[in-house]
Amino acid sequence: MKLSFLSLALATIFVMAIIYAPQMEARASSDADADAAASADADADALAEASALFKEILEKIKAKLGKK
């Protein structure tokens, strides 16, 4: 197969794949409560992680100073 026919065949396959691909549509979530809950969960997770990290650092400092 010549190179020109190969590129034509690939272009045809590409166009057919685009034409017959399933149509997808993105929809925005309109539920404000779900967005607020997700934000609150993310904030709580971040706060818990920061608190655990702070406690770990504090324990290491106490261990270095010899306090229990």
UniProtKB/Swiss-Prot annotation:
Job of this protein: Unknown. Does not show antimicrobial activity when tested on S.aureus and S.xylosus. Does not show hemolytic activity.
Top-rank taxon: Eukaryota
Protein name (database record): U-myrmicitoxin(01)-Tb2a
Keywords: Amidation, Secreted, Signal
Compartments, as annotated in UniProt: Secreted
Propeptide residue range(s): 18-52
Coiled-coil regions listed: none
Residues bearing PTM Leucine amide: 65
Organism of derivation: Tetramorium bicarinatum (Tramp ant)
GO terms under cellular component: extracellular region
